[in-house]
Structures are given as C-alpha cells and as structure tokens.
Amino acid sequence: IAQVLYPEGDNSGNQRFFTDQARNSFVALGLCLFERHARDRRLQLPKAQPPTLGQLYRLSIGDGRPMRDWLQLLADDDLLSDSCRTSLRALCSQADDTLSSILGSLQAPLGLWADPQLDAATSGHDIALDQVRRQRMTVYLCITPDRLEQAALLVRLIFSLLIRDNTRTLPEQDPTLRHPCLLLLDEFTSMGRIDILAQSVSYMAGYQLRLLTVIQSMAQLDAVYGAEQARNLATNHATQILFAPREQQDARLYSEMLGTTTQRRQQRSQGRDTSHTEILDS
C-alpha cells in the first residue's frame, strides 16, 4: 500500500529521501493501529475496530497538540512492539523543517480520507480480493467523470492489491483457484500509472488473470507509462482491436503494425498481330 501511495517520482536525492521517509512513517503508524487493535480485541474493549486508512489519516494529523509531542506520546506506549516504537522515535528525531516536510509528504495522499463519505465507504468491505479466482463473481467499480481525478489514487490502490494478492499462488498449486479473472479496464490511462501492472503483465496470465484495456490512442499509453513500458503492455495483449484513427501519427503506427501484403495480378493485352501477358506484383 505504501508503494502505491508514495511512488518513486523522479528519484532525485531529496525526492527519494522524503518518499522513503513517508513510506516508513506510513508503516510505523499502520503498525501502531494494528497493534492497538490487537490489544483492544484481547481486552475485549467495545471500541475495537479494524484499522482503516481513514484512521491512519487521523493518526497522522494528531489530536491538536504539536506533532512532535503527539508522535512522542505514541512512541511512549509500552504496549507497542519495539519495531513500531523505534520507527516512531526515528520520526521524532528529525529536525523541525525535515519533520514538517515528511509529515506533509505522508499526509498528501491520505487527504482523500478527509472526505467522510470515502472514509465510511472504505471502513468495511463486501468482498475479499483474494477470492476472485475461487468464487464466481462480477465486481463493478464505477467512477463518475467529476470524481475521476479524485478517485484515481484509490482505483490504483484497489487494482494494485488485486494483482498482488492474485499473483502469489499458481492455480496448479491450489486446486481452489478454479476460475479465471478478467480485469476489464475502460479508460485505462485515466487512473494513472499502476506500477505492479506494468511489471506483472508478462506473467499474470499464468495466474489466470486476463487483461482487457480500452484506450483512445497509443499516445495516451506513452504519456503515462513511457514509450518502452507502453510497448511492453501492448505486446503482452494477445489481441488488439484497432478502430479508425483520428490522427495521422496513429494511422502511420497502425499501418506499420499491420505491415504490407504482396498482391500478384496478371494483365493481358492483345493487338492486331501480337498478344502480351504481364504479371505484376504490387
């Protein structure tokens, strides 16, 4: 989840540092939530609720006191594991400006869960993503155009988890994995880059995952995945259906993909005294 929420970016020195720190902070706060939940369940407390991204967002913004004091309060909980407390203390040890930048990077994608509707919708689930090859089901994920930009991150997260959970075990290794699963992605590029999809497209068919994507042009795919990854994605689709292009560049590309065919025709001409037959290739 952290890799989807905090992608690599341009890999420059500062950017890489803050990306790594945001991921580490996300994991530390996630551990804190899960360990608190496990403790509450052991004590049979009525407030014991499964951890959610909404809860993690609220944990990341604190309770109103200075953030360093809030994080230190979390780290001082003796009932948390050593690894969780160590990660929280490492975050507290950062300089003020650095800590502020790390927390800004951490909270940026989690800001989606400030929306109470999204928070409520992602606080429970009706399906388990690792069951799509075990049970016959159809799952629709519908986003209206006015919410597409806002929901793109959530859609990437869902499909990343779906692919991750279903490329761990081959059907030959588990007889309960009986059903192929088709991922039909309309307006594929509108959800942005899904790194795990670009990495797994060459072998996911072996796990009975089928991929059907709909795009407007190859230029869209190039813009999101880059020329090489876009070509790799297109190549790993067994069939491509091309409709009449609107742009000359797409027309040339499709023409090159289709290649040329030699047609042989015979032409015969006859005069008063002579007859001539010619075979032409075109």
Predicted regions and their residues:
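P-loop NTPase motor domains
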Residues: 1-209, 225
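P-loop NTPase motor core of the ASCE superfamily
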Residues: 5, 9-23, 28-31, 198-202, ...
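Hydrophobic/aromatic beta-strand patches that form the interior of the parallel beta-sheet core
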Residues: 139, 212, 240-241
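Active-site-proximal loop/turn and secondary-structure-junction residues that shape catalytic pockets
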Residues: 147, 217-219
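Structural recognition of the conserved hydrophobic beta-strand(s) that form the central parallel beta-sheet
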Residues: 210-216
